[in-house]
């Protein structure tokens, strides 16, 4: 009977929903396992094929862990606040809440159609006031502990979207979304002091099971470095402080560079100290149109303006050195000023060459240098030269001596610095969590009483940001006007909202107890489920969401709300699913390729023509999926054509889980055929109890390998092993009931619908669902082959292959080799001078004569 995947999948999805198969409660009799995947932003486009790759992998792990006896929490929810929904709502004159509900309903139906074992009773939504009540509560705790504050700061301002943009959203001075000009604007923003947790965020990584690239990216993003702050005097009488990790090179500092936004520069301009003020102001205006990312690109041309009217004073030799402004120095890193040592820094060297500045070697290495041609940067080790009291010292000793000198002479001190900046926590938009703060002219900023939470969004119809950059909420005076919780006088609400990252910074805690009214989760639930045992997500979230949520969790731990210092014990990441590039020559239909070859004469010329038409991307056959390229795969269509189990199996089989992989429709059909072959085995049952001798070793090997591979996310090799086993069963005329039962059990986490149906077909009652049926066990001794194939070589050339006992002795193996007719012929008339047996692999006979 042909497998009817549509009927079977609908049947088991209904069973799981009706019987709440995957509903979970606290059970102290079982070990707990909390598996977490990043909850999706419910966009209007619906689920794409990239989502199920992560969800399926942890679903496979979760299903296996249930069968291993664990009490498994595997939840799902919606990260539903955000700009795309708000923009769609504005364009179509629909309230964002209505758009969000529609999108969530669509996503939910798509996920249920794929058979994920989520506990849907724990579903959460960041836009639900009962959820964001606790997001607001966490903000209030941060404020009360001095970690939330207001600050005037330079921000990227989109003149079209009328809101603050992250650096990543600015490309060539325009908004990535709308193409409008982006300018720097000073705005008062709410900030979260994540820098207070910089050390804890780095040091906490040591005890976690994070894949190496995740840990490395977080450490690099935080950017902890050990160096010194050095105070340079100026001819204007002020002090310029710089941070450097190479204070040993101070004698080689021949100029200084400050950021265009530096506070001292503003003061010097106001006092009339700067003689070339017009040129300086023009450069400041130009820099204001660039993002921090554009300004700090290493390969960009170095630009700058020397300040006419003020010089710096090198503290070690009292030499006056010029001061420049340049956009590659950022006000947000270090002190916004640097000392430049062009002999030993490529960027400083290029700048010095352009402006004709002195270049003084101060570190002599083991290899020769030519400072006329390039900076000598191999200076991690070496000996100090041209450096006064540091001459002859090693780099390590020179750093120590210079810091001592700076401190003794009041010229500086040792310092630990971080690249990490405090978190900008304001958005001038409607569709986000209201910030629970009010401003009173008498009392200043005051937090709302916790009893008044949640502070809900007003039900409005105009979501357009104001031309003055204010949030749309600012226009709704009835909502804005309130009373001060401190003095009872008139006050105004904060009209900025929280960023989308807010709700996702603690959602994993709410899953533990999603209906709790008195706290973000009950103490019992937090103590039972914490921490998350395994979290899988995208690498693109490593330095934003993952870092922010670790910060919030560590703060909640410090104030006694959660029982563990870290939120996630294990973090893995999946590779992106890529699509075929329709503009690449190799992906064109054959007739289109022939047409281009006739027109241009060669494939190389045709590819050049495609590049001229479509750009450099046409050279890449495999690219990121995008609507503009028309290569986006709709999972609904795949499920409709092949079934959910086939799609799940394919996404796990398509390659190394951690690496990007191209979507290949032809390979889906192969996975579908494999499932059909497994289904057909139920029609080919053979007589016999248990495992047959000729298949027993492979059965035990497969149980062992599939179990181990699931736990290390080597899903593709686990499936390949199952395919090998199924082929062997067909080669042996079919499967016994016990053999097929084991295949079904091992395949169940990957293809849960079909395997539940087969399990029932094999005579198991409804109370024996595979979802909780114990995982098969293997015996280590039976994983070892009783016989092995060895090669027999004569003078290095293979003459025969023999099947021998796996535990055969060296003497018996050599004797068996010599007894083989082909080997005996090769030895005829010759003298054996050396005999070697490599256990389980080969016999090598060296002969002469």
Identify what each model region corresponds to:
Residues 1-46, 72, 201, 215-225, ...:
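Non-catalytic terminal extensions that flank enzyme cores
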Residues 1-36, 66-75, 99-106, 281-324, ...:
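Conserved oxyanion/phosphate-binding beta-strand-loop segments in alpha/beta enzyme cores
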Residues 2, 18-19, 91-248, 263, ...:
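Residue patterns forming the tRNA-binding/recognition surfaces of aminoacyl-tRNA synthetases
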Residues 3, 224-229, 237, 364, ...:
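Long, charged, mostly alpha-helical binding arms that flank functional sites
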Residues 3, 8-13, 49, 135-364, ...:
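NTP-handling and nucleic-acid-processing catalytic cores
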Residues 25-94, 100, 123-138, 244-245, ...:
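N-terminal catalytic cores of NTP/NDP-binding nucleotidyl/phosphoryl-transfer enzymes
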Residues 79, 144-145, 149-156, 414-443, ...:
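Helix-rich, typically C-terminal accessory recognition domains appended to large enzymatic cores
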Residues 214-241, 290-319, 323-324, 423, ...:
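Flexible, glycine/threonine-enriched loop-and-boundary segments that flank and lead into catalytic domains
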């Amino acid at each position: 009977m042909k497998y009817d995947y549509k009927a079977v999948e609908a049947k088991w999805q209904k069973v799981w929903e009706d019987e709440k198969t995957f509903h979970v409660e606290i059970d102290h009799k079982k070990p707990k396992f909390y598996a977490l995947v990043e909850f999706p932003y419910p966009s209007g486009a619906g689920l794409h094929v990239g989502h199920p790759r992560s969800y399926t992998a942890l679903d496979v792990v979760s299903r296996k862990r249930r069968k291993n006896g664990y009490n498994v929490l595997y939840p799902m929810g919606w990260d539903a606040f955000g700009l795309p929904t708000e923009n769609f709502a504005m364009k179509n004159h629909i309230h964002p809440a209505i758009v969000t509900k529609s999108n969530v309903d669509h996503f939910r139906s798509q996920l249920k159609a794929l058979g994920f074992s989520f506990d849907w009773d724990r579903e959460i939504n960041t836009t639900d006031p009962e959820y964001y009540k606790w997001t607001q509560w966490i903000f209030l705790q941060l404020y009360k502990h001095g970690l939330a504050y207001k600050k005037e700061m330079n921000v990227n301002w989109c003149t079209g979207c009328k809101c603050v943009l992250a650096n990543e959203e600015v490309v060539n001075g325009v908004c990535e979304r709308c193409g409008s000009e982006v300018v720097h604007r000073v705005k008062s923003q709410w900030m979260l002091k994540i820098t207070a947790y910089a050390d804890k965020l780095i040091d906490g990584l040591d005890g976690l099971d994070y894949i190496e690239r995740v840990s490395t990216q977080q450490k690099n993003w935080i950017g902890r470095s050990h160096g010194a702050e050095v105070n340079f005097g100026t001819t204007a009488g002020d002090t310029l402080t710089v941070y450097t990790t190479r204070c040993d090179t101070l004698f080689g500092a021949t100029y200084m560079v400050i950021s265009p936004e530096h506070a001292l520069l503003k003061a010097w301009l106001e006092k009339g100290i700067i003689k070339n003020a017009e040129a300086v102001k023009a450069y400041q205006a130009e820099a204001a149109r660039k993002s921090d990312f554009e300004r700090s690109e290493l390969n960009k041309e170095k630009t700058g303006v020397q300040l006419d009217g003020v010089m710096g004073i090198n503290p070690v030799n009292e030499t006056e050195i010029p001061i420049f402004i340049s956009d590659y120095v950022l006000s947000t890193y270090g002190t916004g000023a640097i000392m430049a040592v062009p002999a030993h820094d490529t960027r400083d060297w290029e700048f010095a060459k352009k402006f004709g500045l002195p270049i003084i070697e101060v570190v002599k290495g083991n290899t020769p240098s030519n400072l006329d041609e390039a900076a000598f940067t191999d200076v991690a080790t070496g000996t100090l030269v041209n450096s006064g009291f540091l001459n002859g010292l090693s780099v390590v000793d020179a750093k120590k001596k210079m810091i001592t000198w700076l401190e003794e002479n009041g010229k500086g001190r040792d310092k630990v610095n971080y690249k990490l900046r405090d978190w900008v926590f304001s958005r001038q938009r409607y569709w986000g969590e209201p910030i629970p703060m009010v401003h009173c002219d008498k009392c200043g900023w005051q937090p709302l009483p916790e009893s008044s939470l949640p502070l809900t969004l007003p039900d409005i119809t105009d979501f357009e940001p104001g031309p003055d950059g204010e949030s749309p909420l600012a226009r709704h005076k009835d909502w804005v006007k309130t009373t001060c919780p401190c003095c009872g006088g008139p006050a105004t609400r904060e009209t900025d909202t929280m960023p989308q990252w807010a709700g996702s910074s603690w959602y994993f805690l709410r899953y533990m107890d999603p209906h709790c009214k008195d706290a973000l989760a009950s103490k019992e639930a937090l103590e039972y489920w914490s921490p998350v045992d395994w979290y899988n997500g995208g690498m693109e979230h490593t330095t934003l969401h993952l870092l922010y949520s670790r910060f919030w969790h560590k703060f909640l731990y410090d104030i006694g709300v959660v029982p563990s210092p870290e939120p996630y014990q294990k973090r893995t990441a999946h590779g992106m699913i890529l699509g075929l590039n329709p503009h690449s020559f190799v992906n064109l239909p054959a007739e289109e390729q022939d047409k281009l070859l006739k027109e241009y004469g060669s494939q190389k010329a045709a590819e050049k023509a495609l590049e001229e038409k479509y750009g450099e991307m046409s050279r890449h056959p495999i690219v990121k999926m995008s609507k503009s390229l028309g290569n986006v795969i709709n999972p609904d269509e795949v499920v409709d054509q092949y079934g959910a189990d086939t799609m799940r199996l394919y996404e796990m089989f398509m390659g190394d889980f951690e690496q990007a992989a191209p979507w290949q429709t032809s390979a889906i059909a192969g996975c579908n055929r494999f499932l059909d072959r497994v289904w057909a085995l139920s029609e080919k049952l053979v007589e016999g109890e248990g495992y047959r001798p000729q298949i027993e070793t492979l059965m035990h090997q497969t149980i062992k390998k599939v179990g181990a591979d699931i736990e290390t996310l080597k899903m593709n090799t686990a499936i390949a092993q199952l395919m090998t086993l199924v082929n062997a069963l067909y080669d042996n005329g079919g499967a016994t009931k016990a053999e097929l039962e084991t295949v079904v059990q091992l395949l169940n986490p990957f293809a849960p619908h079909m395997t539940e149906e087969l399990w029932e077909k094999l005579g198991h009652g409804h109370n024996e669902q595979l979802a909780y049926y114990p995982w098969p066990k293997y015996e280590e001794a039976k994983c070892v082959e009783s016989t092995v194939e060895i090669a027999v070589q004569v003078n290095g050339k293979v003459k025969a292959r023999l099947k021998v006992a796996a535990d055969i002795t060296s003497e018996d193996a050599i004797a068996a080799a010599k007894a083989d007719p082909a080997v005996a012929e090769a030895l005829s008339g010759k003298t054996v001078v050396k005999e070697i047996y490599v256990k389980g692999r080969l016999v090598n006979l060296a002969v002469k004569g």
